[in-house]
């Protein structure tokens, strides 16, 4: 399964990057291709390419604030959670994404 997403917390420092790391590790551990863009205090990092978005089976938005470029995901299956959930339960979140897509986690 191909997963893309965005992580963005209120302050844009710690939780943004922790959520990114936890999601990427959980996705890779489950055998999925995953790319998470961060939108923090220093701007957008690891910006998703349109090709990655187009090829994605699902989008995970681990966000606590309004994000830039949400319209890029129009027409895609989206799971939106807080950064706290992405940090505390990344494996469950990846399993839920696989369930939504109809694949085995």
Model-derived segments and spans:
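Secondary-structure boundary/capping motif
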Residues: 14-15, 45, 89
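N-terminal beta-loop-helix "entrance" segment that forms/cooperates
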Residues: 29-56
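Glycine-rich phosphate/diphosphate-binding loop of Rossmann-like nucleotide-binding domains
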Residues: 1, 8-27
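Short amphipathic alpha-helical segments
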Residues: 18, 71-75, 92
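Short, solvent-exposed amphipathic alpha-helical segments in soluble enzyme
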Residues: 19-24, 76-78, 96
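Mid-chain, well-packed structural core segment of small domains
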Residues: 48-52, 56-79
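Ser/Thr/Gly-rich flexible loops in soluble cytosolic domains mediating phosphotransfer, phosphorylation
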Residues: 2-4, 78-105
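Fold-independent oxyanion-binding glycine-rich loops
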Residues: 8, 39-40, 62-65, 81-83
């Amino acid at each position: 399964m191909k997963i893309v997403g965005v992580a963005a917390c209120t302050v844009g420092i710690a939780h943004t990057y922790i959520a990114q790391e936890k999601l990427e590790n959980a996705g890779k551990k489950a055998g999925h291709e995953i790319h998470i863009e961060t939108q923090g205090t220093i701007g957008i990092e690891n910006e998703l390419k349109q090709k990655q978005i187009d090829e994605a089976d699902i989008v995970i938005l681990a966000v606590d604030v309004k994000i830039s470029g949400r319209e890029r995901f129009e027409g895609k299956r989206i799971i939106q959670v807080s950064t706290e959930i992405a940090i505390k339960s990344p494996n469950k979140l990846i399993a839920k994404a696989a369930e939504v897509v109809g694949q085995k986690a």
